[in-house]
Amino acid sequence: MTPDAIIFDFDGVIADSEIRSAELLGRTLTAAGLPTSEEEALERYTGYGRVETLAAIAARWGARVPTDMAERLAAETTIAFAQPVPAITGVEAFLARTTHLPRAIASSSSTGYIRANLDHIGIAGHFGDHIYSGREHVARSKPFPDIYLHAAAALGIAPARLLVIEDSPVGARAALAAGASVVGLTAGSHCRPALSDALAAEGVGRVFASYAALADHLGLA
């Protein structure tokens, strides 16, 4: 299918930020008496929004979770992301090759954080106002399909005509539930060999290790 528009996840698809999130999450949970490695944080929590992450932590640890866990994570996140994050390799070139298609971002992160990092990378102009946050624009963030349905409606394009680029099983589940076509991208520094299999298990038919490979698959000049 030749898509009518492309929707990008942000963390791990545009910004190489997931490894930083996993590091701070593992460190903060371990300091709170909930031993969590970076690898476990990547596997358990990548792709979730803030509320969903806290729910997953509660499901994992139960009554051992400190009552101020949300505040601890918020404070550590502010520190860890005080500096901008780098771009995923190849995203600028891919955006330059898809200017004929409408694009949007559908993320679990805040629009302020997304815009600040788009400005830092120098690609904000590719998305205009089409930046959508699961914590700001819809009631339920990923893995629910709401944010992708919202982005599709804002673009005026049926979900079945969209191509979504995702790096996490959680995000892929959301996009597929919305009725979109989904490809996996494993170009981030957080991506491990098992990620391709995890994306496939969610129903993602094609997974690409680079934006160059994805561009070739789409037949982009």
Regions found by a protein language model. Give the residues of each.
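Conserved SAM-binding loop
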Residues: 14, 103-106, 164-165
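Hydrophobic packing residues within well-ordered alpha-helices of enzyme cores
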Residues: 25, 54, 91, 98, ...
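Helix-loop "lid/cap" segments that line or gate small-molecule binding pockets
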Residues: 26-29, 49-64, 117, 151-152, ...
